[in-house]
Amino acid sequence: MTVPTGHAAPTAELFKDAFRAHPAGIAVITAQGPDGPVGLTASSVSSVSAEPPVLAFSVSTASPSAAALVQADTLVVHLLGADQLGIAQLFATRGADRFGGAADWYPLPSGEPLLADAPWALRCRILHRLPVGGSMIIAAEVLSIEQGTHDDVAPLVYHNRSYHRLGDQSLLG
């Protein structure tokens, strides 16, 4: 049993340290912006409700991609597998040409960019935008779900500033 060492004021650094110890699944979120497709890597995606299907995520308002993304009416949340580490890194790199030759994607009939080979892609309609601090929390209703052909791929997770593959060896029970 770990004995608490005491309470500390919730500084920004201590808060970030706490969440570095908390693993999170990785997603790439894409939308059609006014100047073309936009996208970013996110570790904040979570399910909110199964009926109706709703998810939520947060993005930094300082990001130009996030600014265009949160103004869209619809978007696609791609839940990534470990074999898509390169895509996660590409969409996390500021100033990268995310929709150039490195990413295999195509526009859906509704206009949003869909990344090929994502294990899961959830097309969503934004329901709510909530500004909090330097971030925007988005709640979105899932309109359709596309399951990729590689549904048995290990998920990509982020923990302590590094990407990891979650596999059978990590199963505890």
Sequence positions of predicted segments:
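Basic, polyanion-binding surface patches
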Residues: 1-173
